[in-house]
Amino acid sequence: MPEKVGKCKYEGCNRKVLPNSKYCICHEKRDDKDIEAFNREIEKIMQDKEAEFYDFRGFYFPESFDFEVIYRHLKDRTFEKSVNFEKAIFYSVVDFKGAIFQKKADFNFAIFKRRINFKGANFEGETHFDGATFEGIAYFTGAEFQLAYFKGAIFSKKVKFINAKFKRVNFENAFFQKEADFEVAIFKDEAFFTSAEFQERVNFKQVRFYTEGNFGNTTFKGLTYFRDAIFEKGVIFRNAKFKEMSDFKYTIFKEWIDFVRVVFEKKADFSFSEFKKGSDFRYSRFEEKADFWDVEFQEADFGYTTLRQADFRYTRFRKEANFGHARFQGVEFDYAVFEKRADFLNSSVTKIISFYNTGFHDTFSFIDVKGKKHRLDFMDTEFSDRTRIGGGTNLERALFSGSTAELVDFTDAKFPEKIYEERLLEKKFHGQLEKDEEEYCPENWQEVSTVYRKLKQAHQRHGDYIKAGEFFYREMECKKKALREKRFSREWFRSFGYSFLKYSCGYGEKPGTVIRNSILAVFGFAFAYLFSNSINLSGNSAVRKFLQSLYFSTITFTTLGYGDIHPINDAGRVLAMSEAVLGAIFVALFIFVFSRKMMR
C-alpha cells in the first residue's frame, strides 16, 4: 500500500509536502531545493487564468531563482491581476525593475535577503510593504506609487527612492538602519513618516510635498537634508528629534509648519528659507547653532523655545513674531526687520542677544527679560515709538549707540549708574578693555553723551523726570570728558565751566548740592571773619565770637544786612562784599534748580 502524502502546513496551501518535510516545494525554506520543481509551481500560478490574484504568500525564493520565470508569462512586465507576496522570503536578488502592478501588490512582512530592484516600477493600485524587512540594498529609484504603505518596514541597508513619485504614502514606524535617499521625490498627497527612525543619513533634497507631510515623533540620528525642498501644504515635525546636523537651507514652506517640541541636538540650518504662512517652534530646543540667516517669516512663534548660538541676521518677519518665555544663549538678530509686533516678554538671556542695525516697525516688547551677566546689543537699532524695554529688564550691559532709543518706553527698566558704553570707554583709557569688548567700545565721549541724551529724551517723553535728570547729569559729564580729550586746547579750558556747574549745582539737577555749597560758604566766611578780626565782635568767649561771625556771615550771604555787626577794616569789607555776591548767586541758583525740578 503506497505511503500517504500529507498537505503543506502553511496556512491555505493544499500542495503536497516534500519528503521528510512539513512544507511543499514553494514554502520549504531550503536553498538547495529542486529549482526546476519550484519554477514549475510558479508557472502554474502564472498560467492559472481562473485565479483572482497571483498568490505567492509565504513562498521561499531560493538564491538561484530567476524572475524571468514570472516575466515570460507577462506582457511588458505588467501584472494585470493583484499579486500577493505576503510573508514571502527572497534569498534571490529581487528584480521588479520597470514592472507595472495594475492592481494591489502585497509584500506585507516579506523578507528580502539580497538586493531589491524596483527601479522605474509603477504601482497603480494599493501597495503594501507593512512590516517588510529589506536586508539588502533597496532601489525604488523612479518608481511611482498610488497608495503605498511601508508601516513598520525595516531597511537594514541603503534604500533609494530618488525621483520616486507618491500619490499617498505611509512610512509610520518604519526603521531605516542605513542611508535613505528621497532626493527629487514627489509626494502628491499625504505623506506620513510619523514615529519613523532614520539611523544614518537621510536625504530629502529638492523633494516636493504637494499636500501635508507628517514627520511627527520621527527620530533622525544621522545627517538630515531637506535642502531646496518645497512644502506646498502644511508639514508637521512635532516631537521630532534630530540627533545630527539638519539642513533645511533654501526650503520653501507655503503653509503652516509645526516644529513644536522638536529637539535639534546638532546644528540646524534654515538659512535662506521661506515661511509663506505661520511657523510654530514653541517649546523646541536648539542645543547647538540654529541658523536662520536671511529667512523670510510670516507669523513666527518661538515661545518657550531654547536657542543656543542662533543666527537670525538679515531675517524678515512680515507678521507677528513671538519669542515670549524663550531662552537665548547667544542669539543674533543683526540687520533683521520686524514689520509687525515682536514680543520677547519674560524671555531669558545668557551670553548675548544682538539687535545690531535691526528695524522694529511696530510694537516691540522686551519686558521682564531675565538675566544678569548678559550683553544686549541695540547698537544702530531702529525702534518704533511703540517700543517698550522695561518691566524689570536688566540693562547692566545694554548698548544703545546709534539707535533711536529716544522713542523707547523704559518704564521700570533696570539701568546701572553708568551705562555700558561709558564703562567700556573708561576701561579703554585705563588699558583694561578685554578683546571681546573692543567691537562694542565707543570711539569717543561725544558718542556716549549722545546715548545719554537719547535716554534722557526717552524718559522725559514718558514722564520719568527723575531718571531723565540722572541721564542729563551723565550726559553733561561725558560732554566735559569730550572737551578734555585734547589738553590745553580751547575746548579743554571750556570744560572747567562744566566743572563749575557740576560742583555748584550738579548741572542743575541737584538742589542739595547748592544747599551744601551754601552752608560751606557761610561757615567758611564765618571762620574768615573770626580769624581776620575784620568785624566788630563783642565778648571774650571764643564760642560767642564764632556765633557772632556765623550770624554776620549768614545775613551777609542772604543779603539781609541788619547793621548791628559790620566790617571794621578793608579786609572785612572785601570779605563781606564777596560773600554777598556769592550769596546772591547761590540763592538765585537754588531757586532756579528747585523750580526746575518742581515744574517737572
What is each residue range found by the language model?
Residues 1-496:
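N-terminal leader/targeting and pre-domain segments
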Residues 28-29, 533, 599:
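A generic structural signal for secondary-structure junctions
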Residues 52, 462, 466, 482, ...:
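Short secondary-structure junctions and interdomain/linker hinges
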Residues 454, 514, 577-580:
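Hydrophobic alpha-helical transmembrane segments of multi-pass small-molecule transporters/permeases
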Residues 488-532:
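Transmembrane alpha-helical segments and their cytosolic interface motifs
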Residues 523-525, 540-600:
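Pore domain of cation channels
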Residues 530-540:
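Helix-to-loop transition at the C-terminal end of transmembrane segments
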